[in-house]
């Protein structure tokens, strides 16, 4: 076995800082939790006679006059009326929402059945306020937002206690295995085993229970959101395990059942922690080939030339503009290097794996224009299920501008055409100060592309054996190409 190194700190850092981990932010302020359920008296008037919110035709019940219940009632009606009902709600935004041939906010954009469901579910939530904790209300809002089937539409949930275990989903042509890649040191012998069940609930049922709360557009992003330790990793969050009945009560231990490839079973009884102590955990990633992908986590983007292989490897960790060294600077430096070493390069590898996106205007269009000026034999763009948002836009832009380029890896987390351009600060529920993420623009990078995922031209599935032995399956497959 090749040399291994412990990457617990990186795993935890990614969990807390990754662009996808915004969903784990602590709420700025929340109403106090109830001590005892409040007895609710239904309004004496028929519901149809109650006025609509802000003069709209939609009817939301008004049951509470003061206190926590009134605050949540106002937030729920504000959320429903402004997030889906009031089609003029984004007129104050600096970047109006527009789809290619129609307004994102037109009456035809949402299906009438979906609008009606929002109205009914909002009224149901208002009635249930006294019987729900604040966390339960927020997860119910997230469940409602998830009905939009938009990977960018979601709520900033409160930070949940985490179980000291981390997973990576390994996709195959005929399915998927979820492998444990981070564990307490005392259970190190169970590293790389398959997840079988959580508290006796089989993996398939875990997915079924968590799926209604997930904002996703394809199966790759769904599985990544639930299991991947570089993303949300909901399967290790106590709050949602309690919400979905996988865990009976907060604070109780949960049993993660794992199975080795030779059939040995492991039952790990774990308790969630408000913050994980990396000194008590072990997590291994291969050091040899994988060191290329994770070689420099301190910079947003960087490249390395391999003259002996006639190859340039470009790694983009995330799309955050570094004003001291822009994408344009990066492209120009590569152009100079190529011209100084014969004027052409056989392979250009652009690695967008584990890239959750970032700033919409990070300058990647300028970079691609420079890329087109380099004499390249073949451009390969590496993607996986955690390639999302602007990572998708970059991959699609390269394909559009350099049609002979090839996508390599596993199905990506989004299709090339999707709603994005987040405006996080513009939709805040007034009393609890919780942000709901709202897309503000439609990205149609490849207008003729059909399908719910960016599908690689060359499908290459990483294997657990390669992972354990330090082999980057996808990168090595590209290196082996003529």
Model-derived regions: residue spans:
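Conserved acidic, small-residue-rich alpha-beta core segments centered on
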Residues: 336-349, 353-481
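Positively charged n-region of N-terminal signal peptides that target proteins for export
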Residues: 1-4, 351
């Amino acid at each position: 076995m090749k040399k291994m190194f412990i990457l617990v700190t990186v795993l935890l850092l990614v969990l807390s800082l990754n662009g996808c981990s915004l969903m784990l932010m602590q709420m700025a302020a929340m109403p106090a939790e109830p001590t005892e359920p409040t007895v609710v008296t239904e309004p004496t008037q028929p519901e149809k006679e109650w006025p609509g919110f802000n003069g709209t035709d939609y009817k939301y019940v008004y049951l509470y006059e003061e206190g926590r219940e009134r605050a949540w009632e106002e937030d729920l009606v504000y959320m429903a009326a402004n997030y889906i009902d009031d089609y003029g709600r984004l007129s104050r935004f600096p970047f109006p929402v527009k789809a290619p041939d129609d307004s994102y906010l037109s009456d035809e954009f949402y299906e009438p059945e979906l609008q009606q469901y929002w109205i009914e579910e909002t009224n149901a939530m208002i009635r249930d306020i006294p019987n729900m904790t604040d966390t339960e209300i927020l997860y119910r809002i997230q469940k409602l937002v998830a009905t939009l089937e938009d990977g960018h539409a979601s709520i900033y949930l409160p930070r949940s206690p985490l179980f000291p275990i981390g997973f990576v989903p390994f996709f195959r042509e005929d399915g998927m295995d979820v492998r444990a890649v981070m564990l307490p040191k005392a259970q190190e012998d169970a590293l790389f085993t398959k997840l079988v069940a959580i508290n006796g609930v089989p993996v398939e049922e875990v997915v079924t229970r968590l799926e209604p709360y997930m904002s996703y557009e394809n199966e790759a992003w769904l599985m990544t959101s639930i299991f991947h330790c570089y993303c949300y990793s909901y399967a290790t969050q106590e709050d949602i395990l309690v919400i979905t009945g996988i865990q009976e009560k907060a604070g109780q231990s949960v049993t993660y059942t794992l199975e080795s490839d030779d059939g040995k079973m492991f039952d790990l009884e774990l308790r969630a922690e408000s913050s994980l102590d990396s000194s008590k955990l072990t997590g291994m990633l291969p050091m040899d080939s994988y060191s290329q992908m994770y070689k420099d986590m301190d910079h947003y983007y960087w490249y390395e030339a391999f003259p002996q292989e006639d190859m340039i490897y470009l790694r983009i960790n995330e799309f955050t503009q570094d004003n001291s060294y822009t994408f344009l600077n990066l492209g120009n430096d590569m152009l100079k290097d190529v011209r100084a070493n014969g004027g052409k390069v056989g392979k250009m590898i652009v690695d967008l794996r584990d890239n959750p996106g970032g700033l919409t205007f990070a300058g990647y269009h300028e970079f691609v224009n420079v890329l087109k000026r380099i004499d390249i034999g073949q451009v390969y763009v590496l993607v996986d299920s955690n390639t999302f948002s602007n990572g998708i836009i970059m991959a699609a832009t390269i394909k559009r501008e350099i049609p002979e380029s090839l996508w390599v890896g596993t199905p990506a987390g989004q299709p090339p055409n999707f709603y994005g351009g987040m405006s996080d600060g513009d939709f805040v529920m007034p009393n609890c100060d919780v942000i709901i993420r709202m897309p503000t623009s439609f990205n149609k990078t490849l207008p003729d592309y059909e399908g719910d995922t960016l599908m690689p031209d060359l499908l290459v599935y990483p294997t657990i054996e390669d992972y354990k032995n330090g082999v980057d399956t996808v990168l090595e497959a590209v290196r082996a190409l003529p």
